[in-house]
A protein has these predicted regions:
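Short N-terminal segments immediately surrounding and downstream of signal-peptide cleavage
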Residues: 22-42
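Short, contiguous alpha-helical
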Residues: 37-41, 45-48, 59-100, 142-189
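Short, flexible helix-adjacent loops and helix caps
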Residues: 55-59, 91, 127, 131-134
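Well-ordered alpha-helical scaffold segments within catalytic/enzyme domains
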Residues: 46, 50-51, 87, 118-121, ...
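Acidic/histidine-rich alpha-helical segments that form the ligand environment
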Residues: 104-141, 150-167
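Sec/Tat signal peptide C-region and signal peptidase I cleavage site
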Residues: 16-20
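Bacterial N-terminal signal peptides
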Residues: 6-15
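Positively charged n-region of N-terminal signal peptides that target proteins for export
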Residues: 1-4
C-alpha cells in the first residue's frame, strides 16, 4: 500500500510541472473572482439580451392572473434596482440609484437603459476586485444599514449573481409563454 501511495504521489509530482506543456489549464491569478466575473458576465448578457429581445408589447405580461407577480417590465426594473443596490454596497458608496424605483418605469427603452446602466456599474465592481479584496468585510455602515452581521464583499457578489440568475429564469418563462427563444437557448454563432 505504501509503495502504491508513493507511486501515485510521484505521478502527481511529475504531472504538475507538465500541465502547461500538455495544454491543461493552470490556476490563474484570482481564480475566485475570475470564475465569478465570467458567470456574472454570461448571465448579465443573457438578461440584457432578454430585455432587448422581448417586444415592448409584452413588457406588461404576467405569467398568470396574480397581480402580486411582477410583469416582465417590472422584473427588468427590479434587476436594475438590485444591481445598483448590491454593487454600491460592495463598493461602500451611496447607491447612485437612491430614490428611484425602476420597477415603476413603463417603457421598454427606459427599462433597458436602466438595466444596462446598472450592469455597467456592476461590471466595474466585479472587474476591479481581486480574490483578496473580495474577502474584505463590507464597510461597517453597509452592515449597519442592512442589519447584517459581518459579511464579506464576495458574499454580496455571489448573492447578486444568484439573484440575477434566479430572475433570468423567470424571464425565460415569460419569453417561452410568447414562443420567444431566450438568449441562453439560441444556437451558438
Amino acid at each position: 500500500m505504501n509503495k502504491l501511495f508513493a507511486l501515485v504521489l510521484f505521478g502527481f509530482a511529475l504531472a504538475v510541472p507538465a500541465a502547461p506543456q500538455t495544454g491543461q489549464q493552470v490556476l490563474r491569478k484570482d481564480p475566485l473572482m475570475t470564475w465569478l466575473l465570467a458567470r456574472y458576465t454570461r448571465d448579465r448578457n443573457y438578461i440584457a439580451g432578454a430585455a432587448e429581445k422581448m417586444p415592448e408589447q409584452y413588457y406588461g405580461l404576467r405569467p398568470g392572473p396574480q397581480t402580486e407577480v411582477r410583469t416582465f417590465g417590472e422584473l427588468v426594473g427590479h434587476l436594475a434596482n438590485y444591481n445598483f443596490l448590491i454593487c454600491s454596497n460592495v463598493k461602500g458608496e451611496k447607491n447612485p440609484n437612491q430614490g428611484n424605483d425602476f420597477e415603476k418605469l413603463q417603457g421598454k427603452a427606459e427599462l433597458v437603459k436602466a438595466l444596462n446602466d446598472a450592469f455597467a456599474y456592476c461590471d466595474n465592481v466585479y472587474g476591479s476586485l481581486t480574490d483578496a479584496s473580495a474577502m474584505e468585510p463590507l464597510p461597517a455602515q453597509v452592515q449597519k444599514d442592512a442589519g447584517h452581521p459581518v459579511e464579506l464583499r464576495v458574499n454580496l457578489l455571489i448573492f447578486n449573481y444568484a439573484h440575477n440568475y434566479e430572475h433570468y429564469g423567470n424571464m425565460v418563462t415569460y419569453m417561452r409563454i410568447k414562443s420567444i427563444v431566450p438568449p441562453s437557448s439560441e444556437p451558438a454563432h
